Amino acid sequence: MIIKKIKSSISGVFGYVPDYVLTNKELEKLVNTTDEWIVTRTGIKERRILKGNLQGTSVIGTKCVNGLLEKTNTDAKEIDLIICATVTPDMAFPSTANLISNEIGATNAYSFDISAACSGFLYALATASQFIEAGTHKKVIVIGADKMSSIVNYEDRKNCVLFGDGGGAVLLEPSIDDTGIQDFILKSDGSGGSMLCLKAGGSKKPASIETINNKEHFIYQEGSSIFKFAVTKMADISEEIMLNNKLTSDKIAYLIPHQANKRIIDATANRMGIGPEKVLLNIEKYGNTTAGTIPLCFWDFEKLFKKGDNLILASFGGGFTWGSIYLKWSYNS
């Protein structure tokens, strides 16, 4: 008797973005920029912003998970584990995943957050898959969500044009039909940590009048260095996963890259030899939602996917962190 290895398959996806749309034209009123400048350099036309008092990332995550449970006809009490990838948790502790778990009534699940910046969703997806493949968990929810507006300085024209709020969630279940996550590669390099970071607010540099006056609770990044590193690492790791699995570009249905900057995405796809028709983009609508970009692509483009399609996910983020996942889509939408 042949025993097939259990794989971890995505059985449903759902996304959420706030109602408020912040356009490039509105940003022209806040900083010295233009719609043309933003679109040319980033590909972004608008982004969503979560408004209202006491509205944190858990609000986005809860919307995603409630929609996912309804869509997949799943009872919250069936969920074994919830992992939330985010760099904008509601608070240092408890975890945002813990707060979401309570909101949705997942009384039988345990939960935790993963912090790997823009690579967070891939880190969380790879982590969750191990519990499924080990046979110890049947239903795991992975969330990628961020309220980036909470750490963006809207007087900094280089950064404020890039980021938006939003996220998505996926349900992982066991599969024995060879669909699901086939392989993943995750990497990190702490030597680049200071190039893309939040300088204050942690135990090393707690909040103070000085850190607030110095605006150290907002995103800091060295743009040109990040651009070069991101293109190199995203392309290298995607090529590595293709080589490891004997995949050529003609066998790839779609590349789903982290939506940081259209120029980074174009350069990465070009390095991989993948044509623009196979590269999924929604950055023009949402900007960079950090851990939310790839699950939002799942949500936006789900109807394109057919069972057995080869998908390559690729991301790069602060840390530095980067990674790639190769999966076979598990259902026809």
Where are these regions (language model features)?
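Short acidic, glycine/serine/threonine-rich loops at helix termini
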Residues: L22, F93-S95, V152-D156, G323-Y326
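Short beta-strand segments
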Residues: S11-F14, A85, S115, K139-D146, ...
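Anion-binding (especially nucleotide phosphate/pyrophosphate-binding) glycine-rich loop
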Residues: N73-T107
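Short glycine-rich phosphate-binding loop at a beta-alpha junction
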Residues: K77-A85, S249-H258
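Flexible, glycine-rich active-site loops centered on histidine and acidic residues
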Residues: E133-G167
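Condensing-enzyme catalytic core mediating Claisen C-C bond formation in acyl metabolism
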Residues: M1-L54, D156-K228, T232, D236, ...
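Claisen-condensing/thiolase-fold acyl-transfer catalytic domains that form or cleave C-C bonds
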Residues: L54, S58, T62-V65, L69, ...
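Acidic-glycine-rich active-site phosphate/pyrophosphate-binding loop
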Residues: V31-T40, M91-G105, I141-M148, S203-T211, ...
